[in-house]
Protein backbone atom coordinates (compact mmCIF):
# COMPACT_ATOMS: atom_id res chain seq x y z
CA UNK A 1 0.00 0.00 0.00
CA UNK A 2 1.18 3.53 -0.76
CA UNK A 3 2.62 5.80 1.95
CA UNK A 4 0.65 8.70 0.46
CA UNK A 5 -1.63 10.46 2.95
CA UNK A 6 -4.80 11.45 1.09
CA UNK A 7 -6.53 14.76 1.67
CA UNK A 8 -10.04 14.01 2.96
CA UNK A 9 -12.61 16.78 2.69
CA UNK A 10 -14.94 16.56 5.70
CA UNK A 11 -18.23 18.35 5.10
CA UNK A 12 -19.80 19.75 8.26
CA UNK A 13 -23.35 18.63 7.53
CA UNK A 14 -26.24 20.32 9.31
CA UNK A 15 -24.80 22.90 11.69
CA UNK A 16 -27.67 22.48 14.15
CA UNK A 17 -27.02 18.75 14.54
CA UNK A 18 -24.14 16.77 16.01
CA UNK A 19 -21.91 17.08 12.94
CA UNK A 20 -19.69 19.90 14.29
CA UNK A 21 -19.23 18.06 17.59
CA UNK A 22 -18.25 14.70 16.11
CA UNK A 23 -15.86 16.41 13.68
CA UNK A 24 -14.02 18.22 16.47
CA UNK A 25 -13.93 15.07 18.60
CA UNK A 26 -12.68 12.92 15.73
CA UNK A 27 -9.87 15.24 14.74
CA UNK A 28 -8.47 15.09 18.27
CA UNK A 29 -7.56 11.43 17.64
CA UNK A 30 -3.96 10.93 16.53
CA UNK A 31 -5.05 7.94 14.44
CA UNK A 32 -6.82 10.24 11.97
CA UNK A 33 -3.67 12.14 11.03
CA UNK A 34 -1.80 8.87 10.68
CA UNK A 35 -4.30 7.86 7.97
CA UNK A 36 -5.05 11.09 6.10
CA UNK A 37 -4.78 14.86 5.92
CA UNK A 38 -8.19 16.11 7.14
CA UNK A 39 -9.68 19.30 5.71
CA UNK A 40 -13.05 20.48 7.01
CA UNK A 41 -15.44 22.28 4.66
CA UNK A 42 -17.88 24.24 6.79
CA UNK A 43 -17.98 27.18 9.19
CA UNK A 44 -15.13 27.97 11.57
CA UNK A 45 -17.28 29.80 14.11
CA UNK A 46 -19.60 26.82 14.42
CA UNK A 47 -16.67 24.47 14.91
CA UNK A 48 -15.31 26.80 17.60
CA UNK A 49 -18.64 26.58 19.42
CA UNK A 50 -18.54 22.78 19.12
CA UNK A 51 -14.97 22.76 20.39
CA UNK A 52 -16.00 24.61 23.54
CA UNK A 53 -18.91 22.22 24.05
CA UNK A 54 -16.68 19.15 23.99
CA UNK A 55 -13.68 20.74 25.69
CA UNK A 56 -11.44 20.32 22.66
CA UNK A 57 -7.87 21.65 22.83
CA UNK A 58 -7.67 21.99 19.04
CA UNK A 59 -7.30 25.37 17.37
CA UNK A 60 -9.26 26.36 14.25
CA UNK A 61 -7.67 27.87 11.14
CA UNK A 62 -9.98 29.57 8.64
CA UNK A 63 -8.73 29.16 5.07
CA UNK A 64 -10.21 29.65 1.62
CA UNK A 65 -8.41 26.97 -0.40
CA UNK A 66 -6.73 23.59 0.23
CA UNK A 67 -3.34 25.06 -0.70
CA UNK A 68 -3.49 27.15 2.50
CA UNK A 69 -3.90 24.12 4.77
CA UNK A 70 -1.00 23.22 7.06
CA UNK A 71 -2.33 19.87 8.35
CA UNK A 72 -0.56 20.37 11.68
CA UNK A 73 -1.25 18.42 14.84
CA UNK A 74 -3.37 20.40 17.29
CA UNK A 75 -5.03 22.43 14.52
CA UNK A 76 -8.14 21.99 12.37
CA UNK A 77 -7.90 23.50 8.89
CA UNK A 78 -11.34 24.61 7.70
CA UNK A 79 -12.39 26.06 4.37
CA UNK A 80 -14.69 28.64 5.92
CA UNK A 81 -17.86 29.34 3.96
CA UNK A 82 -19.22 31.64 6.67
CA UNK A 83 -22.85 30.64 6.16
CA UNK A 84 -24.02 30.02 9.72
CA UNK A 85 -25.15 33.05 11.77
CA UNK A 86 -23.82 33.40 15.28
CA UNK A 87 -26.16 32.02 17.92
CA UNK A 88 -28.08 29.62 15.66
CA UNK A 89 -29.56 27.14 18.17
CA UNK A 90 -28.62 23.49 18.18
CA UNK A 91 -31.32 20.85 17.85
CA UNK A 92 -33.80 22.97 15.89
CA UNK A 93 -34.62 22.66 12.21
CA UNK A 94 -33.14 25.52 10.18
CA UNK A 95 -33.50 26.32 6.49
CA UNK A 96 -30.24 28.27 6.74
CA UNK A 97 -28.43 25.19 8.02
CA UNK A 98 -30.09 23.06 5.34
CA UNK A 99 -28.87 25.34 2.58
CA UNK A 100 -25.40 25.49 4.12
CA UNK A 101 -25.19 21.69 4.22
CA UNK A 102 -25.79 21.66 0.47
CA UNK A 103 -23.16 24.36 -0.11
CA UNK A 104 -20.53 22.37 1.80
CA UNK A 105 -21.15 19.34 -0.43
CA UNK A 106 -21.17 21.51 -3.54
CA UNK A 107 -17.75 22.92 -2.62
CA UNK A 108 -16.38 19.47 -1.79
CA UNK A 109 -17.45 18.07 -5.16
CA UNK A 110 -15.81 21.01 -6.94
CA UNK A 111 -12.59 20.39 -5.02
CA UNK A 112 -12.53 16.71 -5.95
CA UNK A 113 -13.21 17.61 -9.57
CA UNK A 114 -10.21 19.96 -9.45
CA UNK A 115 -8.14 17.21 -7.77
CA UNK A 116 -7.58 19.36 -4.69
CA UNK A 117 -8.92 16.68 -2.34
CA UNK A 118 -8.86 12.90 -2.69
CA UNK A 119 -12.14 11.91 -1.03
CA UNK A 120 -15.22 13.30 0.69
CA UNK A 121 -16.37 12.27 4.16
CA UNK A 122 -19.75 13.68 5.16
CA UNK A 123 -21.19 14.55 8.55
CA UNK A 124 -24.99 14.12 8.72
CA UNK A 125 -27.54 16.48 7.22
CA UNK A 126 -31.24 16.80 7.97
CA UNK A 127 -33.47 16.06 4.99
CA UNK A 128 -36.29 18.33 6.14
CA UNK A 129 -33.88 21.22 6.64
CA UNK A 130 -32.30 20.50 3.26
CA UNK A 131 -35.72 20.78 1.62
CA UNK A 132 -36.55 23.92 3.61
CA UNK A 133 -33.31 25.39 2.29
CA UNK A 134 -34.50 24.86 -1.28
CA UNK A 135 -32.71 21.62 -2.19
CA UNK A 136 -35.19 18.84 -2.96
CA UNK A 137 -32.98 15.77 -2.61
CA UNK A 138 -33.84 12.69 -0.54
CA UNK A 139 -30.33 12.74 0.93
CA UNK A 140 -26.58 12.91 0.38
CA UNK A 141 -26.52 9.99 -2.06
CA UNK A 142 -28.90 11.55 -4.56
CA UNK A 143 -27.36 14.99 -4.12
CA UNK A 144 -23.88 13.69 -4.92
CA UNK A 145 -25.18 11.84 -7.96
CA UNK A 146 -26.71 15.09 -9.23
CA UNK A 147 -23.64 17.22 -8.54
CA UNK A 148 -21.30 14.76 -10.25
CA UNK A 149 -23.62 14.06 -13.19
CA UNK A 150 -23.81 10.37 -12.30
CA UNK A 151 -27.01 8.70 -13.57
CA UNK A 152 -26.99 5.78 -11.12
CA UNK A 153 -25.27 5.09 -7.80
CA UNK A 154 -25.69 2.62 -4.96
CA UNK A 155 -25.62 2.92 -1.19
CA UNK A 156 -23.36 0.51 0.67
CA UNK A 157 -23.46 0.27 4.46
CA UNK A 158 -20.52 -1.22 6.31
CA UNK A 159 -20.57 -2.35 9.93
CA UNK A 160 -18.46 -4.79 11.94
CA UNK A 161 -18.84 -8.19 10.22
CA UNK A 162 -21.34 -6.95 7.61
CA UNK A 163 -21.46 -5.07 4.30
CA UNK A 164 -24.76 -4.35 2.55
CA UNK A 165 -25.42 -2.74 -0.83
CA UNK A 166 -28.93 -1.57 -1.71
CA UNK A 167 -30.75 -1.98 -5.02
CA UNK A 168 -33.19 0.79 -4.01
CA UNK A 169 -33.03 3.30 -1.17
CA UNK A 170 -35.10 6.41 -0.46
CA UNK A 171 -38.42 5.51 -2.04
CA UNK A 172 -41.58 3.87 -0.71
CA UNK A 173 -41.81 0.10 -0.58
CA UNK A 174 -44.34 -0.24 -3.41
CA UNK A 175 -42.24 2.07 -5.59
CA UNK A 176 -39.13 0.08 -4.71
CA UNK A 177 -40.68 -3.21 -5.82
CA UNK A 178 -41.80 -1.62 -9.08
CA UNK A 179 -38.34 -0.18 -9.67
CA UNK A 180 -36.44 -3.43 -9.13
CA UNK A 181 -35.62 -5.14 -12.42
CA UNK A 182 -32.84 -7.49 -13.60
CA UNK A 183 -30.68 -4.76 -15.12
CA UNK A 184 -30.71 -2.65 -11.96
CA UNK A 185 -30.00 -5.68 -9.78
CA UNK A 186 -27.09 -6.72 -11.99
CA UNK A 187 -25.56 -3.23 -12.10
CA UNK A 188 -25.87 -2.89 -8.32
CA UNK A 189 -24.10 -6.19 -7.73
CA UNK A 190 -21.35 -5.26 -10.19
CA UNK A 191 -20.77 -1.94 -8.41
CA UNK A 192 -20.48 -3.77 -5.11
CA UNK A 193 -18.15 -6.38 -6.60
CA UNK A 194 -15.84 -3.70 -8.00
CA UNK A 195 -15.80 -1.74 -4.74
CA UNK A 196 -14.80 -4.80 -2.72
CA UNK A 197 -12.07 -5.63 -5.21
CA UNK A 198 -10.68 -2.11 -4.82
CA UNK A 199 -10.76 -2.68 -1.06
CA UNK A 200 -8.53 -5.73 -1.49
CA UNK A 201 -11.03 -8.61 -1.72
CA UNK A 202 -10.02 -10.37 -4.94
CA UNK A 203 -13.07 -12.64 -5.32
CA UNK A 204 -16.00 -11.26 -3.28
CA UNK A 205 -18.65 -13.72 -2.11
CA UNK A 206 -22.02 -12.07 -2.64
CA UNK A 207 -25.40 -13.11 -1.25
CA UNK A 208 -28.59 -11.66 -2.75
CA UNK A 209 -31.78 -11.13 -0.75
CA UNK A 210 -35.19 -12.01 -2.10
CA UNK A 211 -38.07 -9.57 -1.99
CA UNK A 212 -40.76 -11.73 -0.42
CA UNK A 213 -40.69 -13.77 2.81
CA UNK A 214 -38.59 -16.92 2.32
CA UNK A 215 -37.50 -15.44 -1.05
CA UNK A 216 -40.92 -16.35 -2.40
CA UNK A 217 -40.81 -20.02 -1.33
CA UNK A 218 -40.87 -21.21 -4.96
CA UNK A 219 -43.83 -19.02 -5.82
CA UNK A 220 -45.91 -19.57 -2.67
CA UNK A 221 -45.42 -15.97 -1.51
CA UNK A 222 -45.71 -12.91 -3.70
CA UNK A 223 -46.26 -12.79 -7.44
CA UNK A 224 -43.10 -14.29 -8.85
CA UNK A 225 -40.93 -11.24 -8.17
CA UNK A 226 -37.82 -13.30 -7.46
CA UNK A 227 -38.11 -15.23 -10.73
CA UNK A 228 -38.85 -12.11 -12.75
CA UNK A 229 -36.63 -9.46 -11.17
CA UNK A 230 -33.68 -11.15 -9.45
CA UNK A 231 -32.85 -14.60 -10.83
CA UNK A 232 -32.00 -13.38 -14.37
CA UNK A 233 -29.43 -10.99 -12.91
CA UNK A 234 -27.88 -13.64 -10.68
CA UNK A 235 -27.65 -16.11 -13.55
CA UNK A 236 -26.03 -13.52 -15.83
CA UNK A 237 -23.43 -12.67 -13.21
CA UNK A 238 -22.66 -16.30 -12.43
CA UNK A 239 -22.13 -16.89 -16.15
CA UNK A 240 -19.45 -14.17 -15.98
CA UNK A 241 -17.69 -15.93 -13.13
CA UNK A 242 -19.00 -13.87 -10.23
CA UNK A 243 -19.47 -15.68 -6.91
CA UNK A 244 -23.13 -14.77 -6.43
CA UNK A 245 -25.78 -16.77 -4.55
CA UNK A 246 -29.49 -16.03 -4.39
CA UNK A 247 -32.15 -14.93 -4.14
CA UNK A 248 -32.07 -16.10 -0.52
CA UNK A 249 -34.40 -15.44 2.42
CA UNK A 250 -33.16 -12.19 3.94
CA UNK A 251 -33.28 -13.37 7.55
CA UNK A 252 -31.05 -16.40 7.05
CA UNK A 253 -28.82 -14.56 4.58
CA UNK A 254 -27.96 -11.88 7.12
CA UNK A 255 -27.28 -14.57 9.73
CA UNK A 256 -24.90 -16.33 7.35
CA UNK A 257 -23.20 -13.08 6.38
CA UNK A 258 -22.70 -12.24 10.04
CA UNK A 259 -20.83 -15.50 10.60
CA UNK A 260 -18.61 -14.85 7.59
CA UNK A 261 -20.15 -16.80 4.70
CA UNK A 262 -20.45 -13.70 2.48
CA UNK A 263 -18.42 -10.56 1.90
CA UNK A 264 -21.44 -8.59 0.70
CA UNK A 265 -25.22 -8.77 1.04
CA UNK A 266 -27.44 -7.27 -1.66
CA UNK A 267 -30.62 -5.80 -0.12
CA UNK A 268 -33.58 -5.02 -2.34
CA UNK A 269 -34.93 -2.03 -0.40
CA UNK A 270 -33.98 0.45 2.31
CA UNK A 271 -35.19 -1.15 5.53
CA UNK A 272 -34.24 -4.67 4.47
CA UNK A 273 -30.60 -3.61 4.51
CA UNK A 274 -30.51 -0.84 7.08
CA UNK A 275 -32.07 -2.76 9.99
CA UNK A 276 -29.44 -5.50 10.32
CA UNK A 277 -26.54 -3.07 9.85
CA UNK A 278 -27.76 -0.73 12.56
CA UNK A 279 -28.39 -3.57 14.98
CA UNK A 280 -24.82 -4.75 14.51
CA UNK A 281 -22.99 -1.46 14.50
CA UNK A 282 -24.76 1.90 14.63
CA UNK A 283 -21.82 3.61 16.37
CA UNK A 284 -19.21 2.19 13.98
CA UNK A 285 -21.34 1.98 10.83
CA UNK A 286 -20.24 3.69 7.62
CA UNK A 287 -22.16 4.68 4.47
CA UNK A 288 -20.24 4.48 1.18
CA UNK A 289 -21.70 5.84 -2.06
CA UNK A 290 -20.76 3.38 -4.80
CA UNK A 291 -20.56 4.37 -8.47
CA UNK A 292 -19.54 8.02 -8.10
CA UNK A 293 -16.45 9.40 -9.84
CA UNK A 294 -15.31 10.51 -6.36
CA UNK A 295 -14.81 8.57 -3.13
CA UNK A 296 -17.47 9.37 -0.57
CA UNK A 297 -17.90 7.86 2.87
CA UNK A 298 -20.23 9.01 5.62
CA UNK A 299 -21.37 8.39 9.14
CA UNK A 300 -24.26 5.97 9.42
CA UNK A 301 -26.34 8.12 11.75
CA UNK A 302 -28.43 11.25 11.55
CA UNK A 303 -28.24 14.74 13.00
CA UNK A 304 -29.50 13.60 16.43
CA UNK A 305 -31.23 16.88 17.26
CA UNK A 306 -32.19 15.46 20.67
CA UNK A 307 -28.57 15.49 21.87
CA UNK A 308 -27.06 18.16 19.61
CA UNK A 309 -25.26 20.91 21.48
CA UNK A 310 -24.75 18.81 24.61
CA UNK A 311 -21.23 17.65 23.83
CA UNK A 312 -22.07 13.97 24.27
CA UNK A 313 -22.28 12.75 20.65
CA UNK A 314 -20.28 9.61 19.80
CA UNK A 315 -17.60 10.14 17.14
CA UNK A 316 -16.83 6.48 16.39
CA UNK A 317 -18.84 6.33 13.16
CA UNK A 318 -16.99 9.35 11.76
CA UNK A 319 -13.65 7.88 12.78
CA UNK A 320 -14.47 4.71 10.88
CA UNK A 321 -15.76 6.68 7.87
CA UNK A 322 -12.49 8.61 7.76
CA UNK A 323 -10.48 5.40 8.03
CA UNK A 324 -12.35 3.73 5.20
CA UNK A 325 -12.28 6.84 3.02
CA UNK A 326 -8.53 7.13 3.51
CA UNK A 327 -8.05 3.44 2.70
CA UNK A 328 -10.05 3.69 -0.52
CA UNK A 329 -8.25 6.87 -1.56
CA UNK A 330 -4.85 5.37 -0.81
CA UNK A 331 -5.59 2.29 -2.90
CA UNK A 332 -6.76 4.48 -5.78
CA UNK A 333 -3.57 6.55 -5.52
From Swiss-Prot:
Keywords linked to the UniProt accession: Carbohydrate metabolism, Metal-binding, NAD, Oxidoreductase
Cofactor(s) in the UniProt record: a divalent metal cation
Protein name as it appears in the record: D-threonate 4-phosphate dehydrogenase
UniProt GO molecular function: metal ion binding; NAD binding; oxidoreductase activity
Residue sites binding a divalent metal cation per the record: 170, 214, 270
Catalytic activity: 4-O-phospho-D-threonate + NAD(+) = dihydroxyacetone phosphate + CO2 + NADH
SUPFAM superfamilies hit by this protein: Isocitrate/Isopropylmalate dehydrogenase-like (SSF53659)
Function: Catalyzes the NAD-dependent oxidation and subsequent decarboxylation of D-threonate 4-phosphate to produce dihydroxyacetone phosphate (DHAP). Can also use 4-hydroxy-L-threonine 4-phosphate as substrate.
Binding site for substrate: 140-141, 278, 287, 296
Cofactor, free-text remark: Binds 1 divalent metal cation per subunit.
Pfam families linked to this entry: PdxA (PF04166)
Subunit structure: Homodimer.
Family listed: Belongs to the PdxA family. PdxA2 subfamily.
Alphabetized InterPro entries for the sequence: PdxA_fam (IPR005255)
Protein origin, superkingdom: Bacteria
E.C. code: 1.1.1.408
Amino acid sequence: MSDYLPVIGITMGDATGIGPEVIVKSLAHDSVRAQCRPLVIGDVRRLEVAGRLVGSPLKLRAIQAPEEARFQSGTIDCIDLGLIPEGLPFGKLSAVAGDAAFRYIERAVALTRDEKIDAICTAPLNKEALHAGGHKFPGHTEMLAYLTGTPEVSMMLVAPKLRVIHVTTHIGLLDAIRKIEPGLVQRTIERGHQTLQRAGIAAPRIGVCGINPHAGENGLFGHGEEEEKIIPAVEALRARGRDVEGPLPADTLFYRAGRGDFDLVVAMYHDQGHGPVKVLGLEAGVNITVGLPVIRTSVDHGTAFDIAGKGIADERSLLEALRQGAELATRRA
